[in-house]
Amino acid sequence: MPTRIDMAKFAKFCKDMGFVYQSSEIYGGINGFWDYGPLGVELKRNIKEAWWQDMVRNPPPGPSGQEIRMVGLDCSIIMNPKVWVASGHVATFADPTRKCPGCGKFTRADQLWAILAESDWMNSLLQEFDPVTGKYDSPRLMKWAKGKGQKLAPNLALVKNPEVTLSFLATRVNGQPEAPPSLQEFTRYVATEQLEATGLQEPCPACGAPLGEAKQVSLMFESHAGLDKTEESKVYLRPETAQGIFANYRNVLDSTRLKLPFGIAQVGKAFRNEVTPRNFTFRSREFEQMEIEFFCHPAESQQWYEYWRDLRKKWYSTLGIQSDNLKPREQGADEVAFYSIGTTDIEYLFPFSDDPQELEGVAHRGAYDLGQHAKHSGMAEKFMYFDEERWNADSAGRTTNSFKEWMKTNPPAADVEKYQFTPHVIEPSAGADRFTLAVLCEAYTEDKVPDAKGNEETRVVMKFHPRLAPIKAAIFPLVNKDGMPERATALYRALKPHFNVFYDDKGAVGRRYRRQDEAGTPFCITIDGQTAEDDTVTIRDRDTLKQERVKVADVRGVIEKALTPGV
């Protein structure tokens, strides 16, 4: 399990190493947007390429051992806004949101208590309250209100009017001594200044003021296409990549002559105007998705749902995510989307939370999306699929080989649906940024290793799976003389067309090792005095620290073996 780590410290490490930067940091940054540095962009690119290779170019056989047919798509970020009307996003893609009248900030209503748990003022105040026993010390709370509280939560009722607020709390405790207040009840009391008039209030995580009522707020970013900024020119940045696939379903079918079952895959940016972006890159306003829409016969859709659910969990494990940290969870009836027949969230136990958080959703979407676009586009026939192979295979006993003529005989609907139907869709939808964060968290390790004198020292090592590691190998000349730099440069240039490799001849070799450990490089290759004698080099393994001598001609093969897919 990833240890609980300070995310601010972790974010600084990621910045210092060139994994992730705050976007436009020189101007104070912008909440919910992140940039990937030199190491981060390679890590994320490797993740996307591994996904494309394993799921699109070379997916494993299907449930019955059949070959899976997959193609790719790259859709526009801005589409005709009617797409989002048909999909239901314009009407329903919103979050319950509460605005603070004190500081003007917004908070997700359904995540209030989780956000409060991360609040600076709340964590400071909890030093004066025991959430297990419900006990507190009034003089200490008064001191906090007149001291730290003034700076951390200036609009909290306890800070503005501590005598009144504490009197409400004392009345509650004295009235029910056998049932001490819970943490949530305590928090509501310290946020309440006029109990009779307002009842218990809930505080703003930023300033402590009582929050307003919850309202549904659209999460879609709006813009305009063209120079006229009118209602007719309004467009949206896509909040998901899936709808572009559904809108192009018929185009793909006609241009590729694919037969069911088949999948359409897409990697691309999506945008959601999140109310409270938080937890580093986990909840961002701009993010990248890796999605598949897999189209199949309705009668076969359940087995395909189970296939993709199991395959996607296994894929994460093959790339270095410990099984104990992966938590597949079937969504309950109260949380599954109204159109979904079933959804499994593949969750990961991030170190910033006590509860697993979603990495990917595998949804059985039924025929909902194609049905919606068939209805709203007025082109219903384009979203139907005619199974010609099955029709021809069942020709025995029919009086006609024409499906149109057969339809004139008014066959039962169940018979028609064997040959002509709206396909069901299984959707494995993964977050490239969330998986990148999970890989960073999983890889981050501090351990003890011997230094040059044999004494133990602490090192930070990023234990990336070799397929995902930003740098596959680093090449060092042991010293900058005796022909070693020339041989090291030659090996570097020989490997560079095949892998992302790094050349370093600065400083002691031990320090060079440490720098590559922090970058997550699986192999360090050193050219030394023996290289000139027998054409061998030492290859150091990042995780075991073991070194072995290998022929220069075999170095490429050693690296390639470590990069072989394992799904």
Q: For the regions a protein language model found, what residue spans apply to each?
A:
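NTP/phosphate- and nucleic-acid-binding module
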Residues: M1-V567
